[in-house]
Amino acid sequence: MRVTGLERKILVIVGDGMADRAVPELDGKTPLQAADTPNMDRLAREGSVGLLDPIRPGVRPGSDTAHLTLLGYDPFEVYPGRGPLEALGAGVEVRPGDVAFRCNFATAEERNGELVVVDRRAGRINEDEGTPKLAETINEEVDLPVEFEFKEAVGHRAVLVLRGGDLSADVTDADPKRVGKPVKDVKPTSDDPAAARTAEIVNEFVRKAYEVLKDHPVNRERERQGKPPANVILPRGAGQLEEVEPFSDRYGMSGAVVAGASLIKGIGRMLGMDVPEDEAITGRKDTDLKRKAELALEALDDHDLVLVNFNAVDEAGHDGDARGKVEMIERMDRELVGTLLEGIDPEETVVCLTADHSTPVAVGDHTADPVPVAIWTADARRDPVEEYDEISAARGCLGRFSGLHLLNVLRDLADRIEKFGA
């Protein structure tokens, strides 16, 4: 019997983009329904289950805004834009006044005087295929009227930080978001002269980066191998950091984030949480999930709350790969969730399994569909739900609620919240 007043640890397991819709290829099931997930099902069977609107009903969440809500922050109040978060996660300093962008290494062709995007991810190029060399060349050979830093991140992703005064994040994206469309001219979205100046600088960066990348040895070799060259950079998601109350100050708990994706690591760093690193945690499909689980358990030894994220499920959704998504979910269940459960005492820990958003394979992008949530601890209320998926979760005792309330629900179960009233 557990003694009241003994605070529990909290572990939040996030399958990035794991929720979905019915898929004809899977006989009308969602990938979660089609997948063999004994460990996730155990959490549902022995815990409390429900549906979560990551932000609120009808709002399509980004991974960034959704993770902020999971950690107890209202993104409408603290979201700085994706650029600064990606930069922090990639290990790039973002100072007051800097403007940061998330970027893609992409493939473009010259057509009628325009750069037309033919692959937004350059064949999903990654760090092992030369993106550090491409970034190094950009930093050495591109000249701009302001100081800047460009750095490769996970896979086809990168970050650009413009430094100095007279800059603004009030600018549009260069990314057309679709193949077959020309790279967009970045434009100011306000009357601030700093916005017009920033837009001009970003357009200059895109042009000059293309000139140094189009004949780069890395890209010549990719073309020789029949792979799309990473010859253009697509900046988007401009933002500037503002001061945010640290997680430990807001909730009186120490926290850690275990993730491979730069974005998720950046959120942890912005909130002052610890972000342990390990070269086996790549943020790609080849990440070592057992090592990620071990890292999370190690972090749980000396932190009150640990959030662990697996991003490859989301990538399969974006790629429209139903079978691949089932495979990633099963791997997550076996290697991540299973390993975590082997090292956790439910008397001492509150475990939450959820997704940050839905990425239906039929859509290839995030949607506002609610996601399943299971909360497992020794004295959790048990409902009739025995399987962890989007449909079964609707019958759970947690009902349907906003992600903005999730952390307080977990804190209550962990005896880490004060009573309201007498």
From Swiss-Prot:
Residues 174-190 have a biased composition (Basic and acidic residues). GO terms for biological process: glycolytic process. It comes from the Archaea. Its EC number is 5.4.2.12. InterPro entries: Alkaline_phosphatase_core_sf (IPR017850), ApgAM_prokaryotes (IPR023665), Metalloenzyme (IPR006124), Pglycerate_mutase_ApgM (IPR004456), Pglycerate_mutase_ApgM_sf (IPR042253). It catalyses: (2R)-2-phosphoglycerate = (2R)-3-phosphoglycerate. GO terms for molecular function: metal ion binding; phosphoglycerate mutase activity. Catalyzes the interconversion of 2-phosphoglycerate and 3-phosphoglycerate. PANTHER family: COFACTOR-INDEPENDENT PHOSPHOGLYCERATE MUTASE, METALLOENZYME DOMAIN-CONTAINING PROTEIN. This is 2,3-bisphosphoglycerate-independent phosphoglycerate mutase.
